[in-house]
Regions:
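N-terminal extension/subdomain marker
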Residues: 127-227
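Terminal, contiguous helix-loop blocks that mediate binding/assembly
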Residues: 246-249, 255-383
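Bacterial Sec-dependent N-terminal signal peptides
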Residues: 2-3, 24-47, 115-128
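Sec-dependent bacterial lipoprotein signal peptides
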Residues: 1-28
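A short beta-strand micro-motif common to beta-rich folds, especially ectodomain repeats
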Residues: 89, 101-116
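Surface-exposed binding patches on compact interaction domains or structured appendages
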Residues: 38-41, 62-90
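Surface-exposed loop and adjacent secondary-structure segments within mature catalytic domains
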Residues: 173-198, 228, 232-277
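Solvent-exposed loop/turn segments at secondary-structure junctions
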Residues: 140-143, 174-178, 204-205, 235-241, ...
Length: 383
């Protein structure tokens, strides 16, 4: 006959604790199995560009297998089903949108197979005629390092809402003074990232030739037709002084030799006042090239020194509605485009706020730039 010793209080406590932990583990396992059935999309709207074959993508996150259905027409979609985790879905435009406004093509309904959870994505297409087209024109090569920084700033600002249904063109001379290239900065909705695409090359281009500038400005309308236009000119500037005058005037002669008073002092910081000697264009010639276009610009912005003066503004009085310019020097870095771009394309690119553009410039040089040198003005040309 076996004799069982009575359990000590310590053994009983250990056994009860073990049983409690086991029960909690089982309960936690049951709770994990009862994970809420969920499905979600990375965005509520997939916006296709205006051309047939353009694509946009979004990510589906689900707790289990799912399928999708579509309503509407004018687009294809793949894949039409997925599993637990993340799945990239691509929408492709079957046709172009030749109109002047964004159109809704249809809706994608995503349904979880178990549990019935749902979400939806609207499929839209931008118009062939943009709400507005901005040209960032940066002639010359003396400021090329800063031009590339400016382009990087533009691309950092570009997203699904900037420029929205607007367009951004960039023309500059990365290779030689006799050449130029026209690019577009846009949001690649398929890769969900900013992109920079070459639209046209100019093998015989002279920034000082009004005819070349006039042809380039005409290409803006051909490449990116829009309801409204704006032009930014980033370069060196010397106010109303004629292009063929290196110095301020003949009355400013310091000796028998004409001293070029635009030459920077040794060790001076780079500004947008000096450089690219002999490659200038007169304001009157530039104004004539702008006026010769089939479109009128809503604004001209001079990312250059000394352009906010009554003489220059008078020459531009028939070219545009607003002029943003500096009455003094602008540092080589120029405008903070990453901060300013969203104000050029407010409300999905339908509108702009030029006052906020000026504030972005002032706040940058006042609070964040290494040099506190920033003065900017907004001129209303009708006044």
């Amino acid at each position: 006959m076996a004799v069982q010793q009575p359990q000590t209080p310590y053994v009983q406590i250990i056994r009860r604790t073990f049983a409690l932990l086991l029960a909690l583990a089982v309960f936690a396992g049951c709770e994990k199995e009862r994970e809420p059935a969920e499905i979600a999309s990375s965005q509520e709207e997939a916006v296709l560009r205006s051309t047939a074959g353009s694509a946009a993508a979004f990510t589906v996150t689900a707790t289990g297998p799912w399928t999708l259905t579509t309503t509407g027409s004018g687009f294809g979609i793949s894949p039409t089903a997925g599993g637990r985790g993340e799945t990239t879905v691509t929408v492709t435009a079957s046709d172009g949108n030749p109109g002047r406004s964004r159109v809704k093509l249809g809706t994608v309904a995503l349904t979880l197979n178990a549990g019935g959870a749902q979400c939806s994505v609207t499929v839209s297409q931008s118009p062939a005629t943009a709400t507005q087209t901005m040209l960032l024109y940066m002639p010359g090569r003396d400021l090329l390092k800063f031009y590339k920084q400016n382009i990087d700033g533009v691309l950092k600002a570009v997203d699904a809402n900037v420029p929205g249904d607007g367009r951004v063109l960039v023309c500059y001379q990365p290779n030689a003074h006799s050449q130029a290239e026209m690019y577009e900065a846009y949001f690649n909705a398929e890769k969900q990232a900013a992109a920079f695409a070459l639209l046209k090359s100019y093998d015989d281009f002279a920034a000082a030739d009004p005819a070349c500038v006039q042809r380039m400005l005409a290409d803006v309308e051909a490449l990116a037709p829009a309801q409204h236009y704006g032009i930014i000119v980033g370069c060196h500037g010397k106010a109303w002084v004629p292009a063929n005058q290196g110095a301020l005037s003949y009355s400013a002669r310091m000796s028998k030799e004409l001293e070029d008073l635009w030459t920077p002092a040794p060790g001076a910081l780079t500004t947008r006042s000096f450089g690219d000697t002999g490659r200038s264009i007169d304001i009157t010639d530039f104004a004539a090239a702008v006026k010769a276009q089939n479109y009128r610009t809503d604004y001209l912005l001079f990312d250059a020194c000394f352009m906010a003066n009554i003489e220059t503004l008078y020459d531009l009085r028939e070219c545009t509605d607003y002029v943003i310019a500096a009455p003094c020097e602008i540092m080589g870095e120029g405008f903070p485009y990453e901060r300013a771009m969203p104000w050029f394309f407010t409300d999905g690119g339908k509108t702009r706020d030029l006052t906020k553009v000026c504030e972005a410039f002032w706040n940058f040089y006042m609070n964040d730039a290494t040099t506190q040198s920033g003065c900017i003005s907004l001129a209303v040309m009708s006044e």
